[in-house]
Amino acid sequence: MNSIKQILLISTSIILSSIALIYYVYLLIVPTLPPLDNLADYRPKEPLQVFTKEGDLIAEFGEEHRDFIKIGNVPQKMINAIIATEDRRFFEHYGIDLIGIFRATYKTLLGISFEGASTITMQVARNFYLTSDKTLKRKISEILLSLEIEKHLSKEEILELYMNQIYLGQRSFGFNSAANTYFSKNLSELNTAEMALLAGLPKAPSRFNPFNNYDLAIKRQKDVLASMLRHGFIDESTYILALDQPINLKESKVKKDVDAEFIAEMVRKDLFDEFGEKIYSSGLKVFTTIKNKNQKLANQAVRDGIINYINRHQPREPDGFLDLENIALKHIDGNEEELIKEVTKYLKKFPTFSDFIPGIITKMQPLEIEVILKDGRIINVYKKGLKLIENDKNYEDQTEDYRRIKVGGIYHFIKNRNEWILTQLPEVESALIAMDPNTGEINALVGGFNFEKNKFNHITQAYRQPGSIFKPFIYSAAIEKGVTPATLVNDNFFFMTADELMTKENWEPKNYNDTYDGPTRLRVGLSKSKNMVAIRTLKYIDPKYAQDYVSRFGFDKQKIPPYLSLALGVAEVRPINLISAFAVFANGGYLKEPYYIDKIIDSNDRQIKLKSSITNEDTPRIIDPRNAFIMDSMLKDVIKDGTAKRARILKRTDIAGKTGTTNDLIDAWFVGYNPEHIALTWFGYDTPQSLGDQETGSRAALPIWIDYMKGALDGLPEKIYAEPEGIIPHKINPDDGTLTSNDDESGIYEYFYEEFYPKDNAFFMIN
């Protein structure tokens, strides 16, 4: 009787519990289940990607690294590894594993944490809609959602969602992204052992992270391989081979094809200003105007220019010092590995920027030094890479204590064209921008030595004094007012009293090197960058007129004071404005605003535009084409026989440009172009200080431009600047600028506006 009562009691309890569970499920849980729209139209969180014009990756912005892959492109062996490990009956069940679910539910009711009974479908449900809380409600919701997912999606579609959505550590979502993160490979490039390691990550990505817990990760990988063997996904020979296959870990955050971090940050900021935080997850692809070849040339040229500058000057004290004798005594047994380990541990606190690697000098000989690098490599630097030692004025001292380059000192080392070079982490900065003068399309931009070291963009953010590079705009204003390239200007001492200037001090500017040539043609004054010629020309045309005139080139009028010192570039300009201003001379008179975004593609492959998009179509002409032509011819002479004659090494007749140096050698500039390409280089310190003796624009900035242009113009035919209407070419006497017969062999051709052509050959000089 008691047995019957017990059976009835248990049966009643089960029935009532079932009714309660059904009520709980259908009245309290089912109404709260989310719709499956996200799965039917799957849009994974994808980072913002920035590309070159050719489509090579520059940068990626977003918290989740994801590289979406279609299920048809996933290697079958990768699928097999996942099925064997996560859900071996995946292709047989309808979303749930009943035996596993009953076991998990029973343990949950008893308050015992359950072990994994989740199918792949259930993991998809959880990853898209639910938390990982181990509660009954969440588990029931997961089951119901899994059943719904199986009703609406095929097994292949479910597997594709899983392959791309699952978190696998190191901010990587999806197996294709994880392959790149852990191995720097695509999924299709992995061997069986590497696939098995990835397949073991979903269970506990942090615990089985091979970077942090290598031994645990390998143990888990072996479990995956054993499961694949046990369930017939691989045979015995493949299993044994996989156990011996190498696991070549190689961390890769993002595979960048081109180093252009400054332009990437400019793009990111523009998009963030317009679209906000969603840019980091909406899968936008931005194709810039940056060209692979040009950007790589620019990076190399700036780097070489900085290294050459460092090697021209007295080295600083080492970044640090390690007493190698004491370390050697600790390892008197001759254990070199332990010594290297201790040295590299010390070197870890010194930063690596670009490919400037910290290292310690361990041995010094007259023509060779031995170095241990931060990564443990032992290298030798030979004579070609030891120019810094030649500039160490204390090197010949008898005691090593006074030397700045010495054993135990911490310096930086860089491999340049297969030669190691001893150098130091630069304190100086340099920048380069290059663009098409006819469109404004930026093809290369280097905002500074290294973006990680200093994110300040010297091309777009820095206001610097242009110095003598500003003179062409003064001469352009003068030509528009009737002065000609043949006009004589007195290159002699200039003095103005404080009363004349209405200031507290007299003003007595000087030419560079303090040399003066007397009456000098305007053209020669520009090519030799004569300060007195520029000052007297500005005084003749009036500084206020010049201020109004040059503002049409895009300069901020408030930063261009209408004083005579403007002739020496005492103003403030941004390099990006300066290059677009010079492009006016290159393109026949048009002001083209520099731009760097070619197109933006959204996740639906539709092209979108920023409100701030720049279009240079129908750009108005800001100066007379004759003015641009004459200025171009004068700027060609700067290279032909002036301060930039070093650029003749390029052996081109279609290039023009101007050097620039500010007072006390604080800023060095060069800008140069041909009709199809223009580039500007700047060199200086963030906190203004002298670059050092003779560090003019022609020495510090021009070589960078030459190195860049050598490659940028390689293979491009020379282009002739067409002479516009309204120009009269006529020979002049080079000594006094007066007209002479066109048959006069001693005469040289000069260009004149037809309305300013000196018909009466009147002699005229600006004093």
Model-derived segments and their meaning:
Residues 1-51, 89, 109:
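N-terminal type II signal-anchor transmembrane helix
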Residues 22-23, 27, 111-373, 537, ...:
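Non-catalytic, structured segments within soluble enzyme domains
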Residues 67-72, 392-402, 425-430, 453-473, ...:
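Short active-site loop at a secondary-structure junction
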Residues 82, 228, 298, 366, ...:
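Active-site SXXK
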Residues 91-101, 173-176, 235-240, 479-499, ...:
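Short, well-structured active-site flanking segments
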Residues 107-134, 188, 255-259, 438, ...:
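Conserved catalytic neighborhood of penicillin-recognizing serine enzymes
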Residues 288, 292-295, 299-301, 336-355, ...:
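A penicillin-recognizing enzyme superfamily signal
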Residues 503-509, 542-580, 596:
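Mid-domain, small-residue-enriched loop/turn segments at the edges of structured enzyme/sensor domains
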